Amino acid sequence: MGSVNESCDNYVEIFNKINYFFRDDQVINGTEYSPKEFGYFITFAYMLIILFGAIGNFLTIIVVILNPAMRTTRNFFILNLALSDFFVCIVTAPTTLYTVLYMFWPFSRTLCKIAGSLQGFNIFLSTFSIASIAVDRYVLIIFPTKRERQQNLSFCFFIMIWVISLILAVPLLQASDLTPVFVEPSCDLALYICHEQNEIWEKMIISKGTYTLAVLITQYAFPLFSLVFAYSRIAHRMKLRFANRNQNVTTNTNTSQRRRSVVERQRRTHLLLVCVVAVFAVAWLPLNVFHIFNTFELVNSFSVTTFSICHCLAMCSACLNPLIYAFFNHNFRIEFMHLFDRVGLRSLRVVIFGEQESLKKSMRTEFRSRGGCKTVTTAEPATFQRMNESMILSAMEQDEQL
């Protein structure tokens, strides 16, 4: 009996020694491990992503849900993005962090399958939501007076991104499974690895290579193309509008200060559009390239260190999206300040948004209370369309529609 217990203790000791990926011993039984310091670094990075990403997306969700005026078709896509990014931060990031830090899976087979597919679903939904926001903004410019058409297209976009996300997540649900590494019934010890099994992929209708390429196209290439196309067209419309305004300013007022204001606003708006595209492209490219190299065995072995860096960079997108689509949005900033005031965090509001933004918020609230916002309801169709487009572009200039 003593020898059995001693053997079990040895098994547990070996298990504890090889389970953690980041350690001082670089190679154990042919398995390469990463330095312990890198384990601390990657854990800290994931914790920051989880914390700030969850808070930023949660605030965005709360603002839209609690304020009826914010429940517009355009903000509906931002809400959808915030929901998907929130679950990326509280589900995908922690689960991946655990699989990066530890070799063996301590949970059930069902949780292994759910974790694999849910991680993919959240990522697909997040990136498709980003593309839908860009396309929705583009449609808003092309059909400024066709509100019913805009709503129908937006509804179609919403249904489409959920359906495609679910379809792309199904193969991950099938392929993810447990692989037994060590089973010792006498010690009640069983070690399993949760991963996508090549044997299951070979039995499926779609191969792993085909699936990886399909994900590269649908999750990265197509959304990136949508962002570049939509925002380049929007930027072109804005450029024409800025040129006309600058010409009018020069002709009528000849005021260099106002010209500089027009140029600065154009530069700031274009910079924001470029940032939207750049953040998506830079954040998701390394992870997609890694999956291509790993799937087609262009590298000798799977590197946990390389994967964790690529995945951590992709997760940064979930943190930056609330900044790009909400905190840089004028209407959202106003509502965030209202929210901070409502929960008694006025000092924090001033720290985050500054005195100038707080003053603008007070002036806007007073302006609304006096009935300063009016809507033009009668005009010739062509004139009304130009006015609508002009108002939309003006809103975008103030970062209200991105």
From Swiss-Prot:
Xref: InterPro entries:
GPCR_Rhodpsn, GPCR_Rhodpsn_7TM, NPY_rcpt
Q: Name one Pfam family in it.
A: 7tm_1
Q: Which residues are glycosylated?
A: 5, 29
GO cellular component terms attached to this protein's record? plasma membrane
In the record, what terms sit under GO molecular function? neuropeptide Y receptor activity
Q: Which cysteines are joined by disulfide bonds?
A: 112-194
List the ranges whose topology is Extracellular: 1-45, 107-122, 174-210, 294-306
What kind of membrane protein is this, topologically?
Multi-pass membrane protein
Question: Which SMART domains does the record match to this protein?
Answer: 7TM_GPCR_Srsx
Q: Where in the cell is it found?
A: Cell membrane
Cytoplasmic compartment residues: 67-85, 144-152, 232-272, 329-402
Q: Where are the transmembrane segments?
A: 46-66, 86-106, 123-143, 153-173, 211-231, 273-293, 307-328
- List the keywords (alphabetical): Cell membrane, Disulfide bond, G-protein coupled receptor, Glycoprotein, Membrane, Receptor, Transducer, Transmembrane, Transmembrane helix
State the similarity comment.
Answer: Belongs to the G-protein coupled receptor 1 family.
What function is annotated for this protein? Could be a receptor for neuropeptide Y and peptide YY.
Report the protein name in the record. Answer: Putative neuropeptide Y receptor 11
Species this protein is from: Caenorhabditis elegans
**What does the organism's lineage look like at the top?**
Eukaryota, Metazoa, Ecdysozoa, Nematoda, Chromadorea
